[in-house]
Amino acid sequence: MFKFNDEKGQLKCSFCGKTQTQVRKLVAGPGVYICDECIELCTEIVQEELAKDEEVEFKDVPKPVEIREILDEYVIGQDSAKKALAVAVYNHYKRINSNSKIDDVELAKSNIALIGPTGSGKTLLAQTLARILNVPFAIADATSLTEAGYVGEDVENILLKLIQAADYDVEKAEKGIIYIDEIDKVARKSENPSITRDVSGEGVQQALLKILEGTVASVPPQGGRKHPHQEFIQIDTTNILFICGGAFDGIEPIIKRRLGEKVIGFGSEKKNADVNEKHVLSHVLPEDLLRFGLIPEFIGRLPVIANLEPLDEDALVDILTKPKNALVKQFQKLLELDDVELEFEEGALIEIAKKAIERKTGARGLRSIIEGLMLDVMFELPSRKDIEKCILTKETVADNEPPKLVLQDGTVLDTKTSA
């Protein structure tokens, strides 16, 4: 056996140097030794670091103003939604830190409903919140869920995604955030209860009630359906923040009708002419969600309702250029790796925004538009060492003309003949 060079030939701890006679235990490894005292000290250090991490995550929750400022770095516009989210998230984690009770007053959970058109930033807001708070985050699609006992995913599979995001640390997952997308797709077909089964609509809402409110759920570790002979992961959903997002197409007429505006009719004046067509969603109330098809119990578990406005041309141009991870910056970085400078003319940015509005895809469609414009250039450039700059012009977007390529000697290359 390996021995350290000391006069008595005794084994020593590789960390503190104490001999085996000076300590109670000496644990041997391949050529190294550690004593029980050093093991105890290392354990304390690790526990302190873990406690410090937890303290950073859940004790030092950013103030609503700070949350809003960080959201501004990644998400353009949507000021009212950011404010509502910042307050709701701050109150949620403040509630966790107080153990849900202050002077015997129990603090209820503030789950959030995000209502806004496709591509307005619902998912990005939820993702950014999780990044700010350094908590596990999972996205689930409500359209894949069905009531227990039917073909489709059980609602418990949503919780499994969160547990996986937390590397199977259940305690950490219990303080995470779950974003359920397309929640409007599980609205029942009419606001009146049906005597027939609606397994992908009202049935899903019923199944989600318990986990939204707070319950100890049994989650199959491998996903899929439950069966009696398998082990389950137990997770308490009381402190999990749920954000339910959806476009809620068709809710605007419901809101207008409530506000007293005539949706159909000739020769009748609008009773509420102040309602701007673009800002109808800002007037949404729980009763509108009820008429849309969400059940009262489900609406009651989403006390915070934040609406996102459709993005206009200016907002889309800002989204292309201003955020930390703006698409223009991403594509410039991609070409920079091939030693090529990429420039977007102002006219090109405006035309890209117009195309996204025409396609009704919002910010989500911006990337696919730029990918289409850049495909030929990104195919050719890695093989060319004489190109110094690529310029996307208004004509590139509007008239499908190729981008301008500038050679190292300053010559502007006609890409139509460059191949």
Swiss-Prot record:
UniProt xrefs under InterPro entries: AAA+_ATPase (IPR003593), ATP-dep_Clp_protease_ClpX (IPR050052), ATPase_AAA_core (IPR003959), Clp_ATPase_C (IPR019489), Clp_protease_ATP-bd_su_ClpX (IPR004487), ClpX_bact (IPR046425), P-loop_NTPase (IPR027417), Znf_CppX_C4 (IPR010603)
UniProt keywords, alphabetically: ATP-binding, Chaperone, Metal-binding, Nucleotide-binding, Zinc
Molecular function as annotated in GO: ATP binding; ATP hydrolysis activity; ATP-dependent protein folding chaperone; protein dimerization activity; unfolded protein binding; zinc ion binding
This protein's record includes keyword Disulfide bond: no
Alphabetized PROSITE patterns for the sequence: CLPX_ZB
Superkingdom, natural source: Bacteria
GO biological-process terms attached to the record: cell division; proteolysis involved in protein catabolic process
Database matches in CDD domains: RecA-like_ClpX
Ranges for domain ClpX-type ZB: 1-54
Entry binding sites for ATP: 117-124
Entries under SUPFAM superfamilies matching the protein: Glucocorticoid receptor-like (DNA-binding domain), P-loop containing nucleoside triphosphate hydrolases
One GO location term (cellular component): HslUV protease complex
Residues the entry annotates as binding Zn(2+): 13, 16, 35, 38
Subunit structure: Component of the ClpX-ClpP complex. Forms a hexameric ring that, in the presence of ATP, binds to fourteen ClpP subunits assembled into a disk-like structure with a central cavity, resembling the structure of eukaryotic proteasomes.
Protein task: ATP-dependent specificity component of the Clp protease. It directs the protease to specific substrates. Can perform chaperone functions in the absence of ClpP.
Similarity comment text for this entry: Belongs to the ClpX chaperone family.
NCBIfam families, alphabetized: clpX, PRK05342.1
Protein name according to UniProt: ATP-dependent Clp protease ATP-binding subunit ClpX
Gene responsible for this protein: clpX
